[in-house]
Amino acid sequence: MDMQQAIRAVTQRIDLSEQEMTAVMGLIMNGEATPAQMGGFLVGLAMKGETVDEVTAAARVMRDLATRVEVQAGHLVDTCGTGGDASGSFNISTASALVVAAAGGRVAKHGNRSVSSKSGSADVLEAAGVNLDLSPEQVARCIEQVGVGFLFAPKHHGAMKHAVGPRREMGVRTLFNVLGPLTNPAGAPNQVLGVFSNRWLEPLARVLGRLGSRHVMVVHAEDGLDEISIGAPTRVAELRDGEVTVRLIAPEDFGMERADLSRIRVEDAAGSLAMIRGVLDGQPGPARDIVLLNAGAALYVADVAGSHAEGIEMAREAINSGAAAEKLQQLVSFTASC
């Protein structure tokens, strides 16, 4: 299937097979599609609605082209979300990653600089003094020795350079907004994946199942947050051993009070880092609570904790003991030595 055939199909609302989507993504990622063809296809696909087959095929192509990080899969988890929730919140998943590592998990944290948010995971880690310019081998050693490593997306997904311009110029959400969290270069089999819309909950859980993931929670909160929220109930699609179940969870299920999201908003990476340091230092409040909710979920899917509630208690202990604050310093020190 060539690009013109693909554009005709999606604009007529015809779904592509996995084989057809694989061919089209190959053209895009190898730079053989023009910017106009890429834009036309991605917008047409979005208006039709991407299927599980199409997203699975696209993610496989990206995974095959990625520069891999070779680490053992045991208790390995990613806390990468789609972003795009426009909440202005601090970097919750980045803080969670540090707490998870301090509690005994192993985190391959996939992320990038900010596109639409006040601060991306790369921005806040750089502000903390973390060196992002690591080779895949150095990232692997970081995960093994520190318990958490940052997989800076541009270093691992070089083929994405062909899509950067058209994506920026279109200014609308497309397939690429959800592909990032599906293409962890370390192949983390466990994941807490926040999405910007309920529409993606079950489909992405099923896609990750097809891609070989073991235990995943795909989450979207009723207040719009692409995390497990402290401000509202959160809908969860949980993939475990090939089965997907959907449920609603709320802060009060775990003995926490709801809080307005305005209390966790920041203006920039420096503000996000200050809030993260406060959480890691044990300051009580909604920022700490939302990190506990999300870190607890990551410890649960990584099979470090037997339940979400147990994961929250393990995360709480990692903060109270000082291990979480120490973990950030260990990450800074290790990457500085590379």
Curated annotation (Swiss-Prot):
The EC designation for this entry is 2.4.2.18
Name the chemical reaction catalysed here: N-(5-phospho-beta-D-ribosyl)anthranilate + diphosphate = 5-phospho-alpha-D-ribose 1-diphosphate + anthranilate
Molecular function as annotated in GO: anthranilate phosphoribosyltransferase activity; magnesium ion binding
Pathway stated in the Swiss-Prot or TrEMBL entry: Amino-acid biosynthesis; L-tryptophan biosynthesis; L-tryptophan from chorismate: step 2/5
Binding, anthranilate 2: 167
The UniProt record gives the binding positions of 5-phospho-alpha-D-ribose 1-diphosphate as 81, 84-85, 89, 91-94, 109-117, 121
Species per Swiss-Prot/TrEMBL record? Thioalkalivibrio sulfidiphilus (strain HL-EbGR7)
Please tell me whether the keyword Magnesium is annotated for this protein. yes
Cofactor names from the entry are:
Mg(2+)
The Swiss-Prot or TrEMBL record describes its family as follows: Belongs to the anthranilate phosphoribosyltransferase family.
**What is the protein named?**
Anthranilate phosphoribosyltransferase
Superkingdom to which the source organism belongs: Bacteria
Q: Which residues bind Mg(2+) 1?
A: 93, 227
